[in-house]
Design a protein with these regions (language model features):
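Alpha-helical scaffolding within the catalytic cores
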Residues: 10-19, 45, 49-50, 95-105, ...
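Short, solvent-exposed loop/turn and secondary-structure capping segments
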Residues: 8-13, 40-42, 79-80, 103-104, ...
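Short substrate-entry loop that stabilizes the transition state in hydrolases
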Residues: 1-39, 122
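Gly/Ser-rich "nucleophile elbow"/oxyanion-hole loop immediately N-terminal to the catalytic nucleophile
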Residues: 39-71
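Primarily recognizes the serine-hydrolase "nucleophile elbow" in alpha/beta-hydrolase
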Residues: 57, 63-109
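C-terminal catalytic histidine-bearing segment of alpha/beta-hydrolase fold enzymes
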Residues: 113-115, 121-169
């Protein structure tokens, strides 16, 4: 999921992660908001519509979708999942953050895989522990870690991620 203004630049920034996921057998969509509005706005059904279109046009597993994003895309994936935790299989945010003013409902053991660079340009490493605690208090199952020596954008530890993905229901 591309976050921020959801423009073409953000979609391209998500592309390498998406390519890796496709190479590993996933179907992906990188949505772009034409008007720059966030997909996590209350009442916004565009993500559900995109997922429906993917199922209508491709042969996919019937399992719930996994929301994945990096940077503001990771933050947006987390915010979307927090609005409707029953609709998703989990969230991968590498990195991502949930804003402190975001209301969290019961997350019903929704799995989150969150990684933030030790030298994050936006200092998200400083909030990872409190964010993890907040998500857990809301009922999420959180696998979070600081990536040593990494900045805001970093290489994914695919062995760790695939191990986590293998445990999803």
């Amino acid at each position: 999921i591309a976050g921020g203004s959801n423009n073409e630049f953000m979609a391209k920034a998500q592309f390498w992660l998406g390519n890796e996921l496709v190479d590993r057998g996933s179907a992906i969509a990188v949505p772009i908001s034409a008007d720059g509005s966030r997909f996590s706005a209350a009442g916004d059904s565009r993500i559900e519509q995109i997922i429906g279109q993917l199922h209508a046009s491709h042969t996919l597993h019937d399992s719930k979708p996994l929301l994945v994003g990096m940077s503001s895309g990771g933050s947006e994936a987390m915010a979307i999942a927090a609005l409707n935790p029953h609709a998703y299989r989990g969230v991968v945010a590498t990195p991502g953050r949930i804003k402190t003013d975001t209301a969290l409902q019961e997350l019903n053991k929704l799995p989150f895989y969150i990684r933030v660079g030790e030298k994050d340009d936006f200092k998200w490493d400083r909030i990872l522990e409190s964010m993890t605690q907040r998500l857990r208090l809301a009922g999420a199952e959180v696998n979070s870690a600081i990536v040593q020596d990494a900045r805001h954008v970093f290489q994914i530890d695919w062995e760790s991620l695939e191990n986590w993905l293998g445990k999803l229901k």
